[in-house]
């Protein structure tokens, strides 16, 4: 075995970026097939490959960090920069949706009846389910912070309790959002209002599901004693992502649900 004269982790060749890219292609192509031809086989295949890719890629990262000790302080620092850049790109992603919403709502066209919400659209009451969803997500932000501080203090029981509670709140949010979609009086095809509403809130809902999955992985790792009070970047990244999801929801609630109604 050769001596390593630097603190960085040189990864071995991995198939997971290729399978992940293949899954992304199948999912986007499958979405088109689902929308236009009512066929969901391709998107389901893409989701299956993506799930298998995530499972095995996470397994490899856990193996490299927890059991082989490759995640040195320098590597962890680079992972932090990577997560910050990723969240920045996500902020810009949602900026596009807010831009589309405000572009359409601040100067509604004649086709919309020169009013916002457009003629024939009955918006959702912002003080019913959306307000409950806001309270649920804000509460989950408190519980994930509780879990983080408990982990840093070495309080394992409270870390597990708080993390479990956060996952339950995230799942509850997803259920409420799904119920809201089924009960809405308009669809994604109902003018620019329906398009901006369902695309913006739908992508946020997808991010909540991704964040919940992230937290479930962290819970499983915590149960297996993978995290210590000083070495837990996987959990830290999940907490950052969850706070990002919280903040985006506040902007969505104030813009689309409250002001936009």
From Swiss-Prot:
Q: Which InterPro entries match?
A: Cyt_c/ubiquinol_Oxase_su3 (IPR024791), Cyt_c_oxase_su3_dom (IPR033945), Cyt_c_oxidase-like_su3 (IPR000298), Cyt_c_oxidase_su3-like_sf (IPR035973), Cyt_c_oxidase_su3_a-hlx (IPR013833)
Q: What Gene3D superfamilies would the database entry show?
A: 1.10.287.70, Cytochrome c oxidase, subunit III, four-helix bundle (1.20.120.80)
Provide the topology term for how it sits in the membrane.
Multi-pass membrane protein
Keyword set, alphabetical order: Membrane, Mitochondrion, Mitochondrion inner membrane, Translocase, Transmembrane, Transmembrane helix
Q: Reaction catalysed by this chain?
A: 4 Fe(II)-[cytochrome c] + O2 + 8 H(+)(in) = 4 Fe(III)-[cytochrome c] + 2 H2O + 4 H(+)(out)
- For this UniProt entry, what is the primary localization, expressed as one broad class? mitochondrion
Q: State if Coiled coil is listed as a keyword.
A: no
Q: Which residues lie on this side of the membrane: Mitochondrial matrix?
A: 1-15, 67-72, 153-155, 224-232
The residue ranges for the Mitochondrial intermembrane side of the membrane come to 35-40, 106-128, 184-190, 257-261
Q: Which PROSITE patterns match?
A: COX3
Q: Name one GO biological process term.
A: mitochondrial electron transport, cytochrome c to oxygen
Q: What is the enzyme's class at the highest EC level?
A: translocase
Entry's localization field: Mitochondrion inner membrane
Q: What is its EC number?
A: 7.1.1.9
Gene Ontology molecular-function annotations = cytochrome-c oxidase activity
Q: Where are the transmembrane segments?
A: 16-34, 41-66, 73-105, 129-152, 156-183, 191-223, 233-256
Q: Which GO terms describe its cellular component?
A: mitochondrial inner membrane; respiratory chain complex IV
Q: Which family does it belong to?
A: Belongs to the cytochrome c oxidase subunit 3 family.
Subunit and partners: Component of the cytochrome c oxidase (complex IV, CIV), a multisubunit enzyme composed of 14 subunits. The complex is composed of a catalytic core of 3 subunits MT-CO1, MT-CO2 and MT-CO3, encoded in the mitochondrial DNA, and 11 supernumerary subunits COX4I, COX5A, COX5B, COX6A, COX6B, COX6C, COX7A, COX7B, COX7C, COX8 and NDUFA4, which are encoded in the nuclear genome.
From the Swiss-Prot or TrEMBL record, give the protein name. Answer: Cytochrome c oxidase subunit 3
Q: What is the protein's species of origin? A: Pelomedusa subrufa (African side-necked turtle)
Its encoding gene is what? MT-CO3
């Amino acid at each position: 075995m050769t001596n390593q004269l630097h603190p960085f982790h040189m990864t071995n060749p991995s198939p997971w970026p290729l399978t992940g890219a293949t899954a992304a292609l199948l999912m986007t192509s499958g979405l088109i097939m689902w929308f236009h031809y009512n066929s969901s086989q391709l998107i389901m295949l893409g989701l299956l490959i993506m799930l298998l890719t995530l499972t095995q890629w996470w397994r490899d990262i856990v193996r490299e960090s927890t059991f082989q000790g490759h995640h040195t302080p320098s590597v962890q620092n680079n992972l932090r920069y990577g997560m910050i850049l990723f969240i920045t790109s996500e902020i810009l992603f949602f900026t596009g949706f807010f831009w589309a919403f405000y572009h359409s709502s601040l100067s509604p066209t004649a086709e919309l009846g020169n009013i916002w919400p457009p003629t024939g659209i009955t918006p959702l009451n912002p003080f019913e389910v959306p307000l409950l969803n806001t309270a649920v997500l804000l509460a989950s932000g408190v519980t994930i912070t509780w879990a983080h501080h408990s982990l840093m203090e070495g309080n394992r029981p409270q870390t597990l309790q708080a993390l479990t509670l956060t996952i339950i709140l995230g799942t509850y949010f997803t259920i409420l959002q799904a119920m809201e979609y089924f009960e809405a009086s308009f669809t994604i095809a109902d003018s620019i209002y329906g398009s901006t509403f369902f695309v913006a809130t739908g992508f946020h809902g997808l991010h909540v599901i991704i964040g919940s999955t992230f937290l479930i992985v962290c819970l499983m790792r915590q149960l297996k004693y993978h995290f210590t009070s000083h070495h837990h970047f996987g959990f830290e990244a999940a907490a950052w992502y969850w706070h990002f999801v919280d903040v985006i929801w506040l902007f969505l609630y104030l813009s689309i649900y409250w002001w936009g109604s």
